[in-house]
């Protein structure tokens, strides 16, 4: 929950912990149904822009306004220290986590346009696509929830906390 919203995204900005660009909004009217949700970090603007799409339509856009103590605009910091990525849960507060289901998860190295988001919404990936960083399909029960390989063969996920699997088609 971010500022009373129940659909949000957060990315790290700058080298200091706690400098994050965050935006959230009330969940769309179709709450409780499957939704295709995409978050895009677009650095084609000098300050960068965070965008979220729901079912192929732009849901929100926020221009980066995160500054350090000296007033210098901070930019997205890639994970050069090889730290674990946290998704759908706050690393310092396990009670702040996602409630819902994830069918597929993809991460790309380049920002996707609105048209690309719409195309990818109804397509699958093999793991060899240019710019695909990682991809998981959570459509069948994993053999080992502490080591779930992605489709690229480069990464593994670990499920933490309470979870349950649903059969495909549910």
What is the predicted role of each segment?
Residues 76, 118-170:
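Extracytoplasmic low-complexity segments
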